[in-house]
Amino acid sequence: MSRLPPQTRDQLQPAQQDLHDHFNDAVRRAVGKDPGNVDTASHQDSSQAAIGGPFPFLSVLPSIGRLSLDMIAGLGQVLPDFPPDARETASLVCTSYYKSDYATSAHTKIARSAAMLTDAQIEAITSATRPTDLNHRCIVAYDAAFHLLHVRGALPQDLWDRCLLAFGKEGTVGLVH
C-alpha cells in the first residue's frame, strides 16, 4: 500500500493537475507515443486514470515536483545520443539498489520491450551481478553506476577514462547524474 496513493486528475488541485499533464507529456516524449510504453513508464492505471509510480510523491509539492521531473527529462533531451541500452543498464542498477519496485518494473519493461537487454541480463543486473554477456557500453554503465552506489565517492581514474571513451564528457556527466 502506498503512503501516497494515486489520485485521478479530477481529485487533484489545479497546480497538481498542471503537473499531471506535464508529467504525461514528459513520459510521452521520453518513451514515444505507444500507449503501452506510456502506461509502463508512468505506471498509469487506466481503470482509474490515476498516475502511480513517482507521481503521487512529486505532486505533493507541485513546483518542486516539476523541477525534479524536468531535471530527469532534461538529461534525456540533452543526451539524445546516449546509448539506450546503457541508460537502461544504469537505471536498473540504481532502481534495484534502492529497491524501487515500481521503477525497476518500468525499466525492466522498457529494456525488454525494446530488446535492449535479455531477461537473463535484467535478472543479473537487478540481483547486483554484472552479466558476462553485456556489450562494452553496458559494462561501462554498469560498472560506473555500481561503483557510485556500492563503493561511493569519485569514480577511479580508470573507470572515469572508460566512461569518457564510451560516452564522451557530456554522456559521462549525464551518467553520473
Feature roles, as predicted:
Residues 114-146:
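A contiguous pocket-lining binding segment that forms or flanks enzyme active sites
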Residues 44-47, 80-86, 133-138, 166-171:
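Structural motif
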Residues 65-80, 122-127, 156-165:
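Short amphipathic alpha-helical segments and their helix-coil junctions
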Residues 1-82:
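Secretory/endomembrane lumenal or extracellular ectodomains immediately following the signal peptide
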Residues 135-176:
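Acidic/histidine-rich alpha-helical segments that form the ligand environment
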Residues 64-67, 88-119:
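Conserved alpha-helical segments that form or flank metal/cofactor-binding pockets of metalloenzymes
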Residues 49-59, 83-97, 173-177:
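Alpha-helical scaffold segments that form or flank carboxylate-/histidine-based iron centers
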Residues 58-68, 94-101, 141, 145-152:
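Alpha-helical transition-metal enzyme core signature, strongest for iron centers
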